[in-house]
Amino acid sequence: MSRKVAPFIDIVRLEDKEAKLTAFIRTLVEQTGGVSDADPKGNAVLLIARSTESPVAKAVAALVREGTIRVPVKTILALAPRQEAEGVSETLSAIVGTHGGRLVRDVRLFDAHEQIVLGQAASWTGDCMRRDPMKRDAFECFAGDCSKTAGWARTSFERLWNICEPLPEDLLQPVTAETCPPPVGVEDAVAEPLGSPQV
C-alpha cells in the first residue's frame, strides 16, 4: 500500500514556476499514474490558465510535445492568445488538441485560479487569473495524491467549462504570412520605399 502524500502549499519563485510544474506533472504521469487511460473520467488533463504564456500552459505544452502526456488536454484560457507572441501557435495546438478549448468571456470569472487536474487524485492550483503569473512569486497548492482536492478542482473546471465560450476558429489556425497581417505602417513602407522622392 502506497503512502498518501498530503497536499501542500508552497511559495514558488517567479523564475522557478515552469520548471517546478514540469517536474511535478512529469512525476505524476510517469511514476504514480497521474493520468489513467483506463479511467474514462481521468482520461484527460484538465487545464485552466490565464494565457498561453502562463508557466502552467507552457509546462503542459512541453510535456505534450515530448510525449509524456499522451491523453487529451481540455483547456480553458482567460485571455485570448496573442498570435504575435513567440511560440504561441505551438503552445496553443499542444494544449487545445481535439477539444477545441474554451475562453473566459465574463471578467468576473477571472477570480478563478489557474489549475491542473490529472486523473482522479492529482491536481495543482495556482494564483487567480487576475494576476499575471509572470510578474510575481505566488503561493501554489500541489496535491499529488488527494482525491478530495482533485474532485473539487474537477468540479470547478467542469462548471467553468460549461459557461465559457469555444475558442474562435481563427485562433486555432497556424500563424502564417497570410493569416497574420503586417504591423501598422508596413504596407506604406513597402509601397513607398525609403529614399523615394516626395511629390
Regions found by a protein language model. Give the residues of each.
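PLD/PLD-like phosphodiesterase catalytic module centered on the HKD motif
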Residues: 2-44, 48-199
